[in-house]
Amino acid sequence: VALTILGLSGALSHDPSAALYIDGKLVAAAEEERFVRDKHAKNRMPYESAKFCLEQAGIKPSDVDVVAIPFAPISLFGKARWHYAKRYWYAPDRALDAILMGNRRYKRYRNKIVFCLEQLGFDPKKIKIEPVEHHLAHASSAYHCSGFKEKTAILGIDGKGEYATTFFGYGENGKITKLKEFFDPDSLGGLYGAITEFLGFEMLDGEFKVMGMAPYGDASKYDFSRLASFENGELVINTEYANVIGLRRYKENGKGFYFSPKLIEWLGPKREGDIADEPYIHYAASMQALFEKLSLQMIDYYLGDILKETGKLAFAGGCALNVKLNQKIIARPDVKELFVQPASGDAGTAVGAAAYVSHARGVPVEKMEHVYLGPAYSNEDVIAACARHPGNPAWRKINNTPENIAKIMVDGNPVAWFQGRMEFGPRALGGRSIIGCPSSSGVADRINEQIKFRERWRPFCPSMLDTVAPQMIKVDHPAPFMTFTFEVAEEWKTRVPEVVHEDGTSRAQVLKREYNPRYYDMMKALEVLTGNGVSLNTSLNRRGEPMVCSPTDALNMFFGSDLQYLIMEDILVVKEGAPTYESLD
């Protein structure tokens, strides 16, 4: 009998998702936001995503052996709740809560999950729910999905789970051993989030913007060392300035922030607007530099010995999406290979919790080779969506789709590209992407004008053929998920200028054909036409919206933007007034 495990996340009131393992194979995984069309799907449960997973596998709720959740009760006999109470002494109500009712959030979440499962048709008397500690779920999503056979160092850095904020451990023969955890408020992810808010962005999305702004600034102009220190193996955040609650918060128009008025006294008013200017670019640079410095020190201290032994590191948690840190980690002489869980944020804990329980029940899970784990749609589905759509799309079926789309791109046109199964995790990787020819001058600006409206200092990223990577980024380190940045070779900076960031790096996806043949063939066609087997690749969505899931989502986005071309499977939709490329047929 197959072991069927449904993993559900959403414990921290954002990024609910569902993942389904059957006999160690990840058959489906998706984020709730894509179905409900609400970014991060805050305060929701993974109802639609779980429904999709069951449908994709063709199973009923009664076929599920166990439901794994990435949030667990924390004992009063450990350090976590006492640490929280001691560090938050200035908010006695919250401190006492941690001691007296420290698992209230767990109980509330579990009840919501049970309700969600009942809505899906699970029998409440028969549901087996297995809680996995939040940071163990992150750790499992990194280690168990890495495919590493030897002893593996495991790192988890995020905002916070139940109480833990940082996890150090190792994996050996499928078993995870915890070496050390830090607890709220001592959170590097929390500090980065607080500075993100101060720089005028929102936590959860803004961190990427801070990281993108950092290369424009000079980290030596402002010393941020007072904000956090790592000494004698302990990370301490200065809660005079950041990671604050209650009365210590800076407030503006009734909204409380994660930093204190003291930070404003020191650095001046919080940033407003869309411009990357002084002193804020320097603050971004200083925050990124402090984050890298402390992370690398902590890795040294807790994981250095294991890395010297085998050189394998598995990394997850929201901060694992900091691609600049990852570049520094790969550059360490003691790191042979770094695996970053592509859905490192809380969405990935659905995979992690399920993988953890699968291992605990004696069924190892397979290596995560790709993230095409969401819904797919046929040409017939696409045509039906076009027929129903009020925008009355002009569509036609084309042949040799990859080659023909490359021809449209070479003329400088961005194309909305909708092929195969939707990606799991925050990165578009050639399933739901907007693509452009990176040697075509101004294509990034056109994407911004037509749809993205991004701040100009935010980079666009390349996907490339595995045959191109050795020349362009000069590494043989695997990079299938856009979780690392690499130095771009000088010659390639001029060949594909549209995908190189201010600091000469690119966040690259290096693609092997077997995982996405169509996307690969499109880049092969670009290589034939331009000499470069590289595509500009950004996610298929409008600013502030989740990535597109269905053909109807794609059409809504297409007609709500100035994009001219949309290809869904073999169905090409062209905006009125745009060249139709009739010759392609």
Segments predicted by a language model, with ranges:
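Short, Gly/Pro- and small/polar-rich lid/capping loops
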Residues: 1-5, 395-397
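Short glycine-rich phosphate-binding loop at a beta-alpha junction
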Residues: 60-72, 128-130, 307-318, 416
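Short acidic-aromatic active-site loops that bind/stabilize oxyanions
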Residues: 99-107, 129-132, 273, 277-293, ...
